[in-house]
A protein has these predicted regions:
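Conserved C-terminal structural/oligomerization subdomain of aldehyde/semialdehyde dehydrogenase
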Residues: 1-121
């Protein structure tokens, strides 16, 4: 599938469904707050990207509802789990446990806890 830029009405299904295709949806907005509201108006939240100034990047990371976020990332950079460097997991309907693969907390969900008490005679 060739990459595509698509401008479609906000009610179009491409706005609400994960396609895993090289499609970038376009919609004109009045300001960044409107853009963020539209970005977060989704039942999904795997990845999100942003291009902006140094002063805008912290705002983006605090506001976006996605598990893997990028700011000012150049084309061709990887998206994926790098153990010890980049956990990979989605929020909302894009995740199931809230714990990302390769995160500090991921392995613990597969471990069994056991409390042991020994009273010496």
């Amino acid at each position: 599938v060739d990459p595509a830029l698509v401008e479609a009405p906000l009610g179009h299904r491409l706005w609400k469904h994960e396609m895993f295709l090289p499609i970038l949806m376009l919609h004109r907005v009045a300001n960044r707050d409107e853009a963020m509201r539209l970005a977060n108006d989704s039942d999904l939240g795997l990845t999100a990207g942003f291009y902006g100034g140094v002063d805008e990047v912290p705002w983006f990371h605090e506001q976006i509802e996605a598990g893997v976020t990028y700011a000012n990332r150049k084309q061709g950079a990887t998206t994926g789990a790098w153990p010890g460097y980049q956990p990979f997991g989605g929020w909302k309907g894009s995740g199931s446990t809230g714990k990302a693969i390769a995160s500090f907390y991921y392995l613990a969900q597969y471990q069994r806890e056991q409390s042991r008490t020994v009273v010496e005679p």
